[in-house]
C-alpha cells in the first residue's frame, strides 16, 4: 500500500490531532510557549509524523507475524519546496526561497527509513547516516518501483512514464553508486512576471563525472520555452552554497559550462529524458 499524508491545508494549526493538542502547544527548547501561530503549525507537522510512526510501531504486520508495520514500511519525509519566507531563520545558508531556482527554492531535507529493506534500523538510539548524492523527489517513482520489484514504464509510447526518475534505493542503503545524472530545477517565482528577465529560468544541476564538486548552471527563459541555450550564471555549490559568486565568465570553468550545456541539450524537448533505457 502507498500513502502520502500531508498537513498542507488548512494553513493554520489544528486545535488538536486526536488527543494531542496543537494550537498554542509549541514550545522553545527551554520549554517556554512560543505563542506563535506559525510555530504551532510547524509543530503540527511534528505531531503528524509522530502519530504516524507511533501507529506503525504498535500495529502488527499481517505479512510478517511477530513484526510491526514499521519494520517493513519505507518511510520517507521531505518537502516539495523550500521555505515560504525569505528569511535567514527559514532558509539558513541558502539563497532565496519557495519558487526560486536558487537553492533556497528547492533544496529540502530528505529522510528515509526502512529497517527490513536495509535503510536504517528504525531506532532513535542509532545515529543516522548522511548521503550527499544528488536526488530529486521525482526519483521516488523509480525508488519505490525497485523496492517492490516492479519495472518502470517504457520511455516511449502510449504508456510511457518516469522518464526523469532514477532509483535512489542503493544510496539509501549506503552503497556506493555512480553520481546521478543532471536534474533541472525551474523557477516559478519569476515565471508569472512577464517583464522580468529572470522569468522561467532553469538550472542544470550535476555532480557527475568529469565534474569535481557540485555544479549548477543557470539558463534563461529561452531554454524552457524554445530549448535554446543561453547560460547566465554558474556556481560551485561545494564552496558557495549561497550562490554568491558567479563563475560563468571565468575561462578556467569553460569545460564545466560545456559539460552542463550538453546535459541540457540532451534533455531538451518533448522527447528529452534523463533516465537511461537500462534503468
Where are these regions (language model features)?
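Active-site His/acidic residue clusters
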Residues: 1-38, 84, 91-92
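Histidine-centered active-site microenvironments of extracellular/periplasmic hydrolases
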Residues: 10-12, 47, 55-123
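A long, amphipathic alpha-helix that forms part
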Residues: 21-73
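Flexible glycine/proline-enriched surface loops and loop-helix/loop-strand junctions
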Residues: 30-37, 77, 89-95, 114-129, ...
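C-terminal cap/loop subdomain of S1 sulfatases and analogous C-terminal strand-loop tails that border
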Residues: 83-103, 126-129, 133, 138-237, ...
